[in-house]
């Protein structure tokens, strides 16, 4: 049994398979997941697990070069936006329209669905390198 890091076998496998610039998405329970993209559904009830809890665990185990968010999060969920900025200090941040965000999810290696039920609590993590 693993002693630390991501314990979920599906998430751990996706993280291990990422190459430079590959993307994964951590999503609230309402984000549409495109056909053909791997769905890792962690939602057990409204709010559990939370978006921020899942983001923290994944971010601790992943080299992140860039973060993409829907620009609507700035006004409609300022608290989550602030938390993301505090948790992910080093990567570059990119804000796009929610429609553009959803289009970008079609290229993701996986989408991790949380139980989060607040608006625009979604992030695309772009893999960096560890060297």
From Swiss-Prot:
The superkingdom of the source organism is Bacteria
Please tell me where this protein is predominantly located.
Answer: cytoplasm
Location(s), subcellular: Cytoplasm
Reactions the enzyme catalyzes: beta-D-ribopyranose = beta-D-ribofuranose
Mind listing the UniProt keywords for this protein, alphabetically? Carbohydrate metabolism, Cytoplasm, Isomerase
Assembly and interactions? Homodecamer.
Please give the name of this protein.
D-ribose pyranase
